[in-house]
Amino acid sequence: MTESKAPAVVHPPSMLRGDIDDPKLAAALRTLELTVKQKLDGVLHGDHLGLIPGPGSEPGESRLYQPGDDVRRMDWAVTARTTHPHVRQMIADRELETWLVVDMSASLDFGTACCEKRDLAVAAAAAITFLNSGGGNRLGALIANGAAMTRVPARTGRQHQHTMLRTIATMPQAPAGVRGDLAVAIDALRRPERRRGMAVIISDFLGPINWMRPLRAIAARHEVLAIEVLDPRDVELPDVGDVVLQDAESGVVREFSIDPALRDDFARAAAAHRADVARTIRGCGAPLLSLRTDRDWLADIVRFVASRRRGALAGHQ
């Protein structure tokens, strides 16, 4: 009797920021595309509603309200006529427009596990791109590093998808001392006004939570997914004694003696910040997918999709 082997853990390839036409970058993206499609084949079947089950853009039939339904979808006419609360089901558009807001601030140029957070952000963007690319769906991106913002118009086609991902992967590092501003990047998605679609926010969300208002405005019109990319050192400090640490965005360098008390304080503060981030995102009506550099990111995506689908099926029973 032979023991079954555990599935191999998948790690994102290093994108090695460089020239957009670098053959090595193109090869890394092709490898990533094949990996995503092989791992998730049969999970979504090209259906974007499998990623974020929910309403589309066009009104459909009404049904009885169930706890957890979005009150913005209330069908007041049917509710008044029947004296029972009803919600209007929405029909998904045949063609979906997906916009990625990708945070490439200096805090993502960091990683102590299998890759940098930057690589994980590119991998997450690639997964969303390949999963939402069927049926004439359009994809676009806003990439921000705090000093500059690059906009890739939403278009269709495999060549466009690869160009968009290469643009994300080669976004230059911000100059020293420049902090990212996620609120500005999210707010840029509102102009010009777009048809209803999907907005995916990819960030480590480590900065101030000053992006709630623009995120809420986006969520009022689009389906939103937030993807959090983290490294173990974002949530806990190593037990290594004296160290010199540098703030990736401000450039400030400080010496620390990491003792148990400091580790506990850091862990509590990190946990509190992550809880605030999750609470704020869910308060805007968006789900949160957490990916880490020390975990199998594709397995985490599969679990997220499965959980969302179970919730969608339960809501329709």
Swiss-Prot record:
GO terms for cellular component: cytosol; plasma membrane. Pfam families: DUF58 (PF01882). InterPro entries: DUF58, vWFA_dom_sf. To M.avium MAV169. Transmembrane segments: none annotated. It comes from the Bacteria. It comes from Mycobacterium tuberculosis (strain ATCC 25618 / H37Rv). This is Uncharacterized protein Rv1480.
